[in-house]
Amino acid sequence: MPIREIRHPLIRHKLGLMRRADISTKNFRELAQEVGSILTYEATSDLPLEHYNIDGWCGPVQVEKISGKKITVVPILRAGIGMLDGVLSLIPGAKVSAVGIARNEETFKAQTYLEKLVPEIEQRLAIIIDPMLATGGSMVATIDMLKKAGCKEIRALVLVAAPEGIAAVEAAHPDVLILTASIDERLDEHGYIVPGLGDAGDKIFGTKQKDI
């Protein structure tokens, strides 16, 4: 299933702001949520609908509601938390499954340290969120985990993706749709996306930002 790069003008503008070296923690957090919300809008555009009747102000009226599978949002900790509020602003009824995966900075391999999936996840559409798709190790490990739990329909939302990470996910899980705000140039020798956003987790949580 091909990757989709969402080139909406609002996304292009907000992503440009996020790439600034001098961006504040507050602004980066807010923009991550906003772009996450727009990606969610795109990722749910094909959800099935069903009709039902309600009492309107002038009498009975037929309206629509989302039908089919319920949704679980799966942030990859810790950086995925930075997109969560933006996603839930559009699908507030979704349940949250948390996955903790850290990257070994020497081998770039993914190491799982937390798995908290909602009950009956096999009956849900899983939407994975993570700001960066770099080597693809964390994303592949998360998809492996979800499929092992019985989840059959999975989508992923990332702010920025590297070609290397896209290739890794497509090779391991060609059935998973990835939506991104930008397909960037490459990975550097340290496994960071170029031009990328820097360390999204550090920027979201203010790890290295100076106190004001």
Curated annotation (Swiss-Prot):
CDD domains: PRTases_typeI. InterPro entries: PRibTrfase_dom, PRTase-like, Upp_B, UPRTase/APRTase, Ura_phspho_trans. The keyword NAD does not apply. It catalyses: UMP + diphosphate = 5-phospho-alpha-D-ribose 1-diphosphate + uracil. Its cofactor is Mg(2+). One of its GO terms (biological process) is uracil salvage. Its EC number is 2.4.2.9. The keyword Transferase applies. 5-phospho-alpha-D-ribose 1-diphosphate binds at R78, R103, D130, P131, M132, L133, A134, T135, G136, G137, S138, D199. Allosterically activated by GTP. Pathway: Pyrimidine metabolism; UMP biosynthesis via salvage pathway; UMP from uracil: step 1/1. Gene3D superfamilies: 3.40.50.2020. Binds 1 Mg(2+) ion per subunit. The magnesium is bound as Mg-PRPP. GO terms for molecular function: GTP binding; magnesium ion binding; uracil phosphoribosyltransferase activity. Uracil binds at I193, G198, D199, A200. Keywords: Allosteric enzyme, Glycosyltransferase, GTP-binding, Magnesium, Nucleotide-binding, Transferase. SUPFAM superfamilies: PRTase-like (SSF53271). Catalyzes the conversion of uracil and 5-phospho-alpha-D-ribose 1-diphosphate (PRPP) to UMP and diphosphate. Belongs to the UPRTase family. This is Uracil phosphoribosyltransferase. It comes from Stutzerimonas stutzeri (strain A1501) (Pseudomonas stutzeri). The gene is upp.
